[in-house]
Structures are given as C-alpha cells and as structure tokens.
C-alpha cells in the first residue's frame, strides 16, 4: 500500500476505537453495564494457502499482503511509542523480498532501512509516525486504548484456498485489477 491507503487504515481504526470508547463510556454511565463490549472492526480479508516446510506449518499470503505489511509497520511504531517489549519479531516474511524482511526486522529494533527497495516500508512508517499522535489527540484517545483496540478488536478474515488450487493462476486472476507483478513474483 502507499501512503494514502496506510493513512486511511489508521484513520479507520482510530475512528472505530473512538466510537467504541464513547459507547462504552455511555454504557458505563447508563443502565446496562453487561453490554460493555467493544465492537470489532473488520478490516478485510487475507487469502492464504496452508503450507508445510521443514516441519513447520504456515500460511502463505496470496492476497492481503499489503494490508498485513501495513499492520506490521503500525505494530512496530506502537512498540516504540509505548516503549513495549512485547513485539520481538514480525510474523510476516517475504520469500522473494529479503530487503523487505530486513526492513521490518530493523523497524522492530528501532532502525530504518536505507535499502532502496525498502523505502516504501520506511515512508509508510514515517507517515504513521507523523500522524498517529495528532490523530489520537484529536479523537481523545490515548496510545494504550488505541493499541488495545487494534490488537484485540481489529479482525482480518483469513480465507484459506483449497489445497488443490493452482496458486499462480489464482494469484494472477486476483491481481489483474491491481499493481502489476514483477517477474520474480
């Protein structure tokens, strides 16, 4: 995703976090405290293929990688802004983009990659870093409330494809409307 999509994602999540905070406040002040439940925010889907390699089972993302990458970048930012130690390693990796893997690992460690092919990751991080706190302040949200909402209530629907799916064909069909693929992809 580019900066526009990343900023829209941040805006959407913070809007829902604010809405839920206000609803919970009204419910706590009002009559029915049993309904003190935050509503989830469904962020879309990730189409995945279940793989096993070297004794480990994992999901290969077929569609939704940019959304997952943006969320990982946001998690890195929250780690550093909250001074938290809970996020040690991204659970997202790229088979054909080692520079992106390295860039995400560097973000976890508080560093920005200088590699030319990782600059989109760096620019999205800087964009989120610039806009997160002003957006939260405008919506009267603290960082902890936002982070809790993100990690507990933002939901991505995981859609597994059947094991007999021809992935190259499926991927090609799903991405004909989006960004053109590079040869190695």
Spans of features found by a protein language model:
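Cationic, low-complexity basic patches in intrinsically disordered or flexible, solvent-exposed regions
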Residues: 27
């Amino acid at each position: 995703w580019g900066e526009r999509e990343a900023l829209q994602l941040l805006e959407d999540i913070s809007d829902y976090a604010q809405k839920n905070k206000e609803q919970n406040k009204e419910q706590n002040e009002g009559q029915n405290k049993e309904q003190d439940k935050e509503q989830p925010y469904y962020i879309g889907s990730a189409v995945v293929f279940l793989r096993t390699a070297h004794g480990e089972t994992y999901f290969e993302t077929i569609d939704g990688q940019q959304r997952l990458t943006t969320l990982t970048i946001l998690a890195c930012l929250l780690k550093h802004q909250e001074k938290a130690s809970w996020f040690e390693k991204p659970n997202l990796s790229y088979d054909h983009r080692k520079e992106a893997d390295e860039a995400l690992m560097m973000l976890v460690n508080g560093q920005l990659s200088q590699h030319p092919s990782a600059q989109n990751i760096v620019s999205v991080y800087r964009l989120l870093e610039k806009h997160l706190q002003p957006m939260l302040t405008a919506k009267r949200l603290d960082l902890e409330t936002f982070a809790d909402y993100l990690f507990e209530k933002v939901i991505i629907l995981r859609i597994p494809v059947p094991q007999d799916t021809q992935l190259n064909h499926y991927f090609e069909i799903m991405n004909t409307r989006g960004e053109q693929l590079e040869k190695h992809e």
